[in-house]
């Protein structure tokens, strides 16, 4: 099967009915890996505070870690952004972090974001850290919140840094939200797709479909024209050793080993966060080193699902 998309049709001639299924061939996905991070906003405040003292945005320790992952192991890094850090968020930090939003972020590092956009991308995640904000949303609401994040990314990082892939907050979204994201230019969304869980992080997929995607790298919902990618390991959920074992299991799978996606959340990087992970650095570098040594190469999810 050489075509990017092949449509299979089964017809019951006696009943006059038919079923259709589309099969996608994704040669650019094979052997690729990506690391993404959700809930990002705090590093942008740090850049803003230090806009007159940092000579490079990679003087920010969080971004410096991802640059190390890229320079040593060729990682492609994707950061999903909140629009605002709110009063509610402050309770999870022991230091007095101020409220702020993306409209106040400096554009002093715009050219550096643009220059590094071949390996570092940004996208919309949610307006703020609220529970499942798009599970029962409207197209108008999510479009408005998405556009607010896009507007600021374009202002402080440039169009080169804006990705057409995201993970929505909590990976929960109704069909209206998915259609709105497709209309906003998004081509793919990542999730956990874990069957049998109250929160499977699977957007609006049925339990049957969740079980199907769980054993695969990608699924394309042809009704909404949206690809969904399976996240193979959430690096802040288990021990680093368990993460590596989980990644090794995915890599060895004939149906999941073609493309590996690992993900973490920004807040676990900071010592003042209530659930701070002192080994955050190892949780980022060890998986990407493992994948690189296994022969995988950094590849954005958008490149993995592209045609041609």
Would you name each region that the model predicts?
Residues 76-174, 196-200, 266-270:
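Metal-dependent polysaccharide deacetylase catalytic core of the NodB/CE4 family, i.e.
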Residues 2-6:
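Exposed beta-strand face motif in extracellular beta-rich ectodomains
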Residues 16-111:
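Active-site beta->alpha N-cap acidic-glycine motif
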Residues 56, 89-101, 160-161, 167-266:
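Active-site-adjacent pocket scaffolds in enzyme catalytic domains
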Residues 51-66, 95-109, 139-152, 240-249, ...:
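Well-ordered, non-membrane alpha-helical segments in soluble/globular domains
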Residues 30-31, 71-78, 115-121, 159-164, ...:
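Loop/turn elements at helix/coil->beta-strand transitions in domains of secreted/extracellular proteins
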Residues 189-193, 264-308:
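C-terminal domain-boundary segment and adjacent tail
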Residues 10-12:
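Conserved structural position at the C-terminal beta-strand
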């Amino acid at each position: 099967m050489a075509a990017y998309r092949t449509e299979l049709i089964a017809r019951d001639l006696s009943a006059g009915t038919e079923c259709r299924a589309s099969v996608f061939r994704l040669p650019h996905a094979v052997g690729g890996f990506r690391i993404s991070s959700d809930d990002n906003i705090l590093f942008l405040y740090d850049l803003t505070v230090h806009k007159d003292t940092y000579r490079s945005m990679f003087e920010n320790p969080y971004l410096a870690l991802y640059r190390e992952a890229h320079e040593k192991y060729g990682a492609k890094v994707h950061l999903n952004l909140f629009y605002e850090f709110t009063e509610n968020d402050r309770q999870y930090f022991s230091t007095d972090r101020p409220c702020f939003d993306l409209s106040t972020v400096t554009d002093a590092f715009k050219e550096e974001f643009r220059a590094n956009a071949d390996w570092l991308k940004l996208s919309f995640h949610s307006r703020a850290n609220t529970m499942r904000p798009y599970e029962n949303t409207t197209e108008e609401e999510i479009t408005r919140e998405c556009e607010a994040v896009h507007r600021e990314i374009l202002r402080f990082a440039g169009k080169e840094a804006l990705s057409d892939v995201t993970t929505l907050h909590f990976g929960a979204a109704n069909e209206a939200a998915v259609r709105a994201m497709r209309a906003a230019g998004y081509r793919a969304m990542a999730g956990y797709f874990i069957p049998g869980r109250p929160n499977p992080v699977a957007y609006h997929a049925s339990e049957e479909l969740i079980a199907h995607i769980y054993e695969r790298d990608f699924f394309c919902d042809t009704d909404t024209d949206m690809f969904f990618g399976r996240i193979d390991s959430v690096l802040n959920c288990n021990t680093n050793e368990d993460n590596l074992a989980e990644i090794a299991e995915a890599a060895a799978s004939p149906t999941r080993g073609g493309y590996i996606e690992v993900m973490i959340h920004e807040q676990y990087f900071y010592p003042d966060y209530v659930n701070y992970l002192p080994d955050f650095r190892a949780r980022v570098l060890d998986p990407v080193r493992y994948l690189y040594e296994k022969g995988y190469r950094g590849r954005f999810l958008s490149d993995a699902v592209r045609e041609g």
